[in-house]
């Protein structure tokens, strides 16, 4: 099955981004001690995992081997900066940035992919990501307010 190279590139990027954000949310859950925040982070990781498998199915349907697409080696710079980044920014903000990147990829895919089943999937993912962005913003503001009040 032939597919536009831009769509293929964006799908591959989306797949790796879902994997990365899932891991980011799991890291955030491990780093946070507030139960409601842990639930939120773990729930978001599950959502990203489901989205990852949906996109991997799309890639398989169009004849792309998913194993060839997934970035095998972790980004050393990312691992090294994780602790530093946690100290500088709250975890909600960090995940918010990643979700905004996902939203941009999904919007591009909706714009250029004309296959209805795939665009419906992108729209469902976009809705979930948009909800997550709102929640991350809300939690981030709450965390910043608590930090401000405690100082």
Spans of model-derived segments:
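Conserved alpha-helical segments that form or flank metal/cofactor-binding pockets of metalloenzymes
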Residues: 39-71, 136-147
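Alpha-helical bundle segments that constitute or directly flank the non-heme di-iron/ferroxidase center
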Residues: 1-32, 88-113, 131, 135
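Carboxylate-rich helix-loop segments that flank metal/cofactor sites and access channels
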Residues: 57-93, 97, 101
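A short linear boundary/processing microfeature
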Residues: 31, 58-61, 65, 112, ...
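Terminal, compositionally biased segments
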Residues: 1-5, 57, 127, 131-134, ...
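Short, charged, amphipathic alpha-helical segments
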Residues: 38-46, 93, 120-130
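Acidic interhelical loop/turn segments
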Residues: 107-130, 148-150
């Amino acid at each position: 099955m032939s597919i536009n190279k831009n769509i293929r590139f964006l799908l591959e990027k989306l797949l790796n981004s879902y994997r990365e954000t899932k891991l980011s949310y799991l890291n955030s859950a491990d780093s946070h001690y507030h139960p409601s925040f842990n639930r939120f982070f773990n729930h978001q990781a599950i959502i990203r995992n489901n989205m990852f498998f949906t996109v991997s199915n799309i890639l398989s349907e169009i004849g792309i081997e998913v194993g060839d697409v997934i970035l095998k080696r972790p980004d050393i710079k990312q691992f090294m900066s994780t602790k530093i980044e946690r100290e500088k920014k709250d975890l909600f903000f960090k995940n918010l940035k990643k979700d905004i990147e996902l939203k941009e990829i999904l919007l591009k895919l909706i714009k250029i992919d004309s296959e209805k089943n795939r665009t419906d999937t992108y729209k469902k993912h976009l809705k979930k990501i948009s909800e997550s962005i709102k929640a991350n913003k809300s939690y981030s503001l709450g965390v910043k307010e608590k930090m401000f009040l405690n100082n």
